[in-house]
Amino acid sequence: MAITIVSNFTSGRFYPSANPINTTVTSNNSGKCNFRYICDLYVNGTKVFTDKIFPDPNTGYGFFLLSRVLQDYIATLGLSNSFAMFNLGASAAAPSASLSVYCRFGEEYDNTINCDGTVLQYPNLATSTTFFVYEGAFDYEDFPTYNHTNYLMGTASATASKSFLTNSPREVDVTYNDTYYLDFLTMATINSNWRLIVTINGVLFTQFIAPTLTNVRRYRLAVGPLNINKLTGAPIINQEITSYEVYLAHNNIRQSEIFRFNVKDPKTFTTRLGFVGLLGGIEHFTFYHRNQKGFTIDRRTYEKTLGRNISNAWSYTVGDRGTTTYKLNAQEQHRVSTYCSQDMSEWLYEMWLSPDVFTYRRPELQEIRIYDEAGTYTGTPDSRILFWVNDTSNLRAGDFIVVIPEKIEGYVEFIGRFQIVSVVGNIVDVGATYGSYYPPRQLCAYIYKDTNFDILPVTISDNAIEVKQKTSRPVEYSLNYQMAYSKNTIRG
């Protein structure tokens, strides 16, 4: 009895889950009666599957194709509202977006001459190397040149530029209430030696020290303006900031590529979609044109006898219903569009291919006016500074709001987080007085309520993708999607 691994897995290699994960074994008993190779698959140290195959008739080899099996144990780790900078990017237990895998090989056969005996099993005759599988998929033309070390963050003593798990352009537009996430792989323990560095035009702006995290080999950074401002407790990404860059460092040495975010003013009509990209990370894209919303409603009806029997006489009252409606089903649908760059248009097809797409219900950004109640702006210390807010329906006394005022050179007093004292009509009072903030004049500002976001699942209803060719002009993308749940209706 001898099993030989002809084609072993590369020890310590990270394999994308949707691409081939194959191994080949052979045995000197492959000519025996009813011979089959056995592969016991271990995920995170636990046997989860046993595969048995007959030997190849030409070579006698056993070819095990494991990708489809392993995909059953792969799952995206959903977003949380923790707003920590360093987060787990995979669960510790399967199903997970990062798995530790190895195989034990054996064989079974009937050792009698006439092939009429009992088939005996001989498991655990050889063990493969341990390798890792992460949620990801590389295109047919790209996978032959795939090298996992390009994505594996290390602890190098010299500057490195390892890639995050995304195919998106490395320069993206965001606004103040946008979240953004970057996943990465590493074998190293995440602890205080790791830092997320934020720079402005290459100059250090701020940094975030990592806590000690469970070793799951895949991690997620929260690097959007909403994430950073929530974590710091103040809107440090504000109208003074036109762009910022982030990268990952170990012992103050850069280990990752540099990702750049251009901070744009909010637009009137925005629809921000998130989706799981081909490399398993959470991707984002914002459509800026008006969202066209509608409902597709399916209803069933039947005719019932009109009237009622009272004292053996049929009668009805005007208003009685003869046609009765039942089984109402309403599906909310949307159509969105926007212009985008050539690079973005090449990448956007990943949204159409994603099995998991969602839209955000984010803290709403509003443009407001900040004014002196006395109307003088000349130094009445006790004069209240009030906010005029167009829509106060979601604001209550005790709520916290984040204020990002217009850019005035040398004046940054109202950039901050405030607690609402009272809401009267459109007037919001946060307890500010002229003597505390000295506004030079009436100010414009953006505010949003300091609260968590919600994720609403959607399904893309387009079955054909129009591929945009590269041109010298921006290209327009349109998308139809519907909510991945029906509206609740009253039973008829």
Predicted feature locations:
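Preference for solvent-exposed, low-hydrophobicity sequence contexts
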Residues: 1-266
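Extracellular/virion structural assembly segments
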Residues: 2, 181, 185-186, 208-216, ...
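A structural detector for beta-sheet-dominated domains
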Residues: 6, 42, 185, 197-201, ...
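Short, acidic/charged, Gly/Pro-enriched secondary-structure junctions
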Residues: 100-108, 348-364, 402-406
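A broadly conserved detector of short glycine/acidic/proline-rich loop/turn motifs that flank catalytic sites
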Residues: 157, 162-165, 169, 340, ...
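Phosphate-coordinating catalytic segments in nucleotide- and nucleic-acid-processing enzymes
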Residues: 174-175, 383, 387
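Small/polar beta-strand repeat architecture
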Residues: 365-382, 390-400, 404-460
